[in-house]
Design a protein with these regions (language model features):
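Short alpha-beta junction capping motif
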Residues: 22, 74-113
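Short, surface-exposed beta-strand/loop micro-motifs that present aromatic residues
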Residues: 64-65, 156-172
């Protein structure tokens, strides 16, 4: 999982002329949208330290109906429990994603059923499709020939990367049975060994890079 080329660095740098940031989605329904609070700052720190990208490495969070959310084309959603979007939030998320926005949803174990249900409300005529291991997202910056890394075992199922597309553009990436966010957390939280945490962080870089250059 090494850097694939100097060309990628140049492209990444030019795409991110301004500081890159992520907005965590504050959703309703009772689920812990705030879980893994150190994950996004750690991912953005890793991104800045290992690529030419300048970042705002803060845990920025807002609701889908907040006006400021339009300043953040890269959205992140995670949690262990239920998600319930209001009708206004459904419309807002659909509008953001259809206007060059991108959502990475990471199941932190327990999010799956409600996320799929709410995504169907946002895009009733679109389906999540599994990404093969040779998809460009697994090679966009670091190499993952075996696809999505697995951080925590949970039910012992293989990790899955599923995506929703608008024509050829990926607008939603859903990482399931992988728990990338736990891998981005401070080492003391889960006490995962560094190789597992590093794989999660590098996959996070790939996701960001792919979303910006597709």
């Amino acid at each position: 999982m090494k850097l694939i080329s100097l060309i990628s660095i140049v492209i990444f740098s030019s795409v991110n002329a301004q500081s890159f940031s992520v907005a965590r989605v504050h959703y309703g329904g009772g689920g812990d949208w705030y879980s893994d609070p150190s994950s996004i700052p750690n991912l953005l720190t890793y991104l800045e330290e290992n690529t030419p990208v300048s970042t705002i490495n803060e845990d920025i969070h807002m609701k889908l109906t907040d006006k400021e959310i339009n300043q953040y084309p890269y959205l992140y959603m995670t949690g262990h429990g239920n998600i319930r979007l209001t009708e206004d939030e459904v419309i807002s998320l659909r509008t953001i994603l259809m206007n060059n926005g991108f959502l990475h949803a990471d199941d932190n174990y327990g999010l799956d059923a409600s996320f799929r249900r709410e995504l169907k409300r946002v895009f009733p005529n679109k389906e999540l499709v599994p990404l093969p291991n040779d998809h460009p997202i697994f090679y966009s910056y670091y190499r993952f020939p075996n696809g999505l890394p697995k951080v925590h075992e949970h039910d012992g199922k293989p990790p899955q990367a599923l995506a929703l597309f608008d024509e050829d553009r990926m607008i939603v990436l859903y990482t399931y049975e992988s728990d990338l966010g736990d891998g981005w957390e401070d080492a003391s939280v889960h006490e995962d060994p560094w190789p597992i945490r590093e794989a999660a962080l590098q996959m996070g870089v790939n996701i960001i890079y792919y979303s910006l250059t597709q």
